[in-house]
C-alpha cells in the first residue's frame, strides 16, 4: 500500500490546482494500491492550535506505523511546510519503521523555506525521509547546495 499524506488547503479546496486533487485522481485510478489521508486545513484544523495539529498528525502517523507491512510506502505532499507537521510525521514513521520508504515532496521556494527554517534544520529534516522530490531543478539545486543528496526533480 502507498499511503499519501496530504492537506486540503482553503485556497485550492475543490479545484484542480491542489495536491489533494492530484492524489485523489491517482487514488481513484488505482484504489487497491493507494490510500490517502487528508488533513483539512480549513477553520476546524486551524482552530486546534499548534498542539492540536501536532496531536492529529502524531496519532495518524502512529496508526499507520502500527499497521505498516513490508512493501508499504509513504508519500508526504507538503514536506517542510511548517503548518503540515510532516517532519513530525516522518520522525515517527522512521522511529517505529526504520526501513519504511518515505518520499517527501518539497515545493516551497528557497526564500519561504529560509523564512521558516535555518539551513541546518532543512538539512537535518532530510535525514528522516528516503527521498525528497521537487517540482523544479532550481529547488533541487538549492537543496543539493545545502548538502542534501537524496533530492530528485
Labelled PLM ranges:
Residues 37-63, 76-84:
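A short, charged, and often flexible helix/loop element on the N-terminal side
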Residues 8, 78-80, 108, 136-138:
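Helix N-cap/beta->alpha junction signal
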Residues 67, 122-125:
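Structural alpha-helical scaffold elements that stabilize or flank donor/cofactor-binding regions
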